[in-house]
Structures are given as structure tokens and as C-alpha cells.
Swiss-Prot record:
ATP binds at residues 34-41. Gene3D superfamilies: P-loop containing nucleotide triphosphate hydrolases. Residues 2-238 form the ABC transporter domain. It comes from the Bacteria. Keywords: ATP-binding, Cell inner membrane, Cell membrane, Membrane, Nucleotide-binding, Translocase, Transport. GO terms for cellular component: plasma membrane. The gene is hmuV. This is Hemin import ATP-binding protein HmuV. Its EC number is 7.6.2.-. The complex is composed of two ATP-binding proteins (HmuV), two transmembrane proteins (HmuU) and a solute-binding protein (HmuT). Its main location: membrane. The lineage of its organism: Bacteria, Pseudomonadati, Pseudomonadota, Gammaproteobacteria, Enterobacterales. It comes from Escherichia coli O157:H7.
Amino acid sequence: MISAQNLVYSLQGRRLTDNVSLTFPGGEIVAILGPNGAGKSTLLRQLTGYLQPDSGECRLFNKPLNEWSITELAKHRAVMRQNSHMAFPFSVQEVIQMGRHPHRTGNQDNETAQIMALCDCQALANRDYRQLSGGEQQRVQLARLLVQLWEPTPSPKWLFLDEPTSALDIHHQQHLFRLLRQLVHERQFNVCCILHDLNLAAHYADRVVLMQKGKVIANGKPQDVLTQQALTMLYGADITVLKDPANHSPLIVLDH
């Protein structure tokens, strides 16, 4: 379980997270939604130990994040940031194998090959990472995270993904979320992701968190949270929320 209690973080006099408390019990895909500047990425950085809050506390398995060593924390959670540029000419396979750094054993070629296949990266293996498209880089970064967390442990693993679909085509968006569901159900993975695509969140997330001006304003199942009234107030956009006939999840449509 990961928990956040009364997180406050300010920068240049502006509250980026304002008394945020959340619990992530595990076994689910959680989507964090909100307009630009709502505090989503700041919250994610605090939940993963990359940013210390001004006040409040984050815990992993009831142990404060600041009491975990970097190496041990990296065995339990992995993070995909919005930007993953590299200055040096690493091959795709080398980038993916960087996920082994927290572990004492060296590269596991069979494991790496399996994960590259899961993430549709086999054909990219020998290419210069810097020459890939944005979507290809996102697939490679996901593979690196899975290599980092693939080694079996008694406790669950956590994937934190900041806008993981921002550069993916529709096929790879679907592939990503089907894979995430498989990891949740079969390998004790838990997923927390920031999204801007409301319909992806409605279709695939087990739980949705809405943020506005550093505060959590809603937290629950997609059908309870993604209402027309809530989304219109949150985004200031003219939208209609319908019901998807295939699975009865919310279907968000922009009005003309």
C-alpha cells in the first residue's frame, strides 16, 4: 500500500499540492486527471520519493519514503516521467537493460527479450534511442520500468506513469492498457498514471482522482467521478457525458 497524508508543497508562493491525502491499497489502475497546472506531476513526484513535501508524509508499506534506500525503493516502484531525453548514443536494448541497475545480478537476456516483446520493442533493439519517435521512446521506457520490477518479490510492485500515452498511436494506447491490466491481475503490479485522455481513464481505470489547483476534488470509480457536472466545472469546457454501450463506462464527448 502507498499512502499520502496531508501533502503540502509550495513553489514561489503557489501551492502545487494543498493538503492532499490519498490511499492506494493496490490491485488497481488509478488515473489522476485534471487541467494543466493542477498539481498532478508534483503529486506523482512526492508519491515516488523524488520530491520532499514541505509538510505531510508519503509511506510505502507503512514505512516513510524518506526511510527507504534508493536501491530498495527502486525494487518496489518504477517511474516514467513526461520527458525521457538522453544525451548519449545508447541503443534501445542498452536503455532497457538500465532497469537492472538496482539488482545485484547482471542483465537477464531472456527476461529482457520477453519484456521487449511485451512492449513491442523487438524491432527497435539496435537503434539509437535518440533517433526514435516520441511514441517509440515511451514504449522503450515502459520496457525499462518492467525490467526494473520484473524480479519476483513477496510484496506488490508499483508503476507510476506520467502521461504514458501522450505520443502513442491508438493501437499502442490500447496495447499499453491491456498490458497494464494483465500486469495488475497476473504479477501483483499496481498502476498510478496521469492522463489527459478522459475516455482512456473512463475505459481502463479502476479508480479516478480529479485534481484542481493542488487539491483532490474527487476520488472514486469512473462512473461516479466522471460526471458531466464535475468535468464541466473542472475543465471549463462544453462537454456531454454519455454511457458507453459496450461496457457502460462514461463516454465523454466535446460539444460543437
